[in-house]
Amino acid sequence: MKKNRRDFIKNIGIVGAGVGLLAPVATMAIESQNENLLLPDDDGSKGEVVLNILQTTDVHCQLHPHDELFWENGKAVFRKTGGYSMLSTYLKKERKKNPYSFVIDTGDMFQGSELSVKTTGQALVPILNALKYDLYIPGNWEVIYGKQNMQKLLGALQAPKICANMYHDLGDGKRGELIFQPYYIWHVAGVKIGFLSYTDPLVPLRQSPAYSKGILYTQPEENLAHFVDVLKNQEGCSYILLLSHLGLSQQIHLANQEACSGVDYILGGDTHERVRKPIVCKYSKVVEPGAFGSFVGKLQLKIKDGKVISDQYFLDEISEKNCRADSSMDKLIQSFEKPFTEEINKIIGYSTEPLYRYFVIENTIDTMILDALKWKLPEVDVVLSNGFRFCPPRVTRDHTGNVPITNGYLFDMLPVDSVVRVAEASGKQIKEWLEKELNNVFAKNASERFGGWVVKFSGMKVIFNAFGEKGKRVQSVEIAGSPLDTEKVYKLSACERQGDPEDVLCRMKGVKNSRNTEYTLHKAITEYLEKNSPVSPVPHKNAVALDAPETLLTQVWGVDYEFK
């Protein structure tokens, strides 16, 4: 593996040259270089011009076409989508059709695959640069390799980066300068389009705290109104787009706050939601274009007499029916994957069931992970696993008639090979923790929703009201078939979160006798598959909502939106 990494670094030398020459970030905003992009015989004020703003988000390093889940006619159906080669073709076609095109990515571009892990994200840099994005913002997972690596990776991308709520942590609670510029201005067709950006301020809670060490996050409301005022009244922007990685619930909440007055659209990310029709809120419209490169959000703004007179939004599917693979992008990807191809494609087991992670409550991917950990740690009462959203489905069967699980797909499911940790907690602690976790997902107040789906568990059965009263959602809990005893001490396991205190396990505070095992998640799952393949990870209905279907696909409610 060391040789493979050396070969890769030699292959990617051009990236290193760019990374080492990062300019210090100024506090001033960025403005586009092509000050007045105009078509021939168009002075930007006569006639009508259509701006074509294209958005990807949460691609999670999914380089190749993959199986994707769609909800159609009341059931899950699957088809092939995504991959940077088809995305490259799509973007080239869009730019050719409309030179007023502007391409953005709203985060989570360096976490989610084995190639990214093996190269600390560096393999993605030349691929992203080849796609010629115009603007980036950091997602919640850009910190996966630490602050310094985040700065180097984003610094090596050949387009501006903006974010108005990530600051250098000077220590002792002292806030330094912004890490990235707060906004960007696109001068086009005689108008100014302002872009302002915010990422998730809850990163230190959602991810291992060590990942974001050296960074201070603030709530968007702290300076949003200020920067909107700057863009409108100082810079003279005709239209303001807020690029965010907050999650759809949080974005809807923000769009209903007075601080968002003056923002025309929120182009969001994080929760992998597929908004096909803009959600109209009090101050702004909100959209989010899915994940894994399966879709591109397309916002078209019609300009006349130096003003935006109308907007249209589309969610374009990236699939073989409308995009052929770009051979030059294919070759570029293969050149960086070559040192690792054999390991990535190595089959480590099989599943008789389609593998997916789209349902809010239980999924086959998480069931397989829990089954593996319960098999490895039979002495543990309850096995816990995070409610991750990332990882596309895998349903295509090979000659065996089963779904192959490769080493690369193991990294797609669990990019962080965390150590398995055990600890003890009382029944009372478990009950209180469950209430908090359920509120994170289903809170009536959208601003209180954060993180992924419902936390996953095995060895415990929980019946709850998803949309019940805060602190009173849990109706019953059983562990090993017996009612939860609030006084009894139970043994739990979960992944270690680097930087957590000794008495915290999977966000549960005050646990006792915590220790790391000799197993990592990957080791436990690999050994489980070696002994038990093919596996049949049918969800065990350990989590049952009385007021929601087991096929619930979104935590967003109270607005005109449906995941499909």
Give the predicted meaning of each segment:
Residues D43, V49-Y90, K96, V125, ...:
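Catalytic centers of hydrolytic enzymes
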Residues K3-E320, V360, T364-A372, V383, ...:
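Acidic, metal/ion-coordinating pockets
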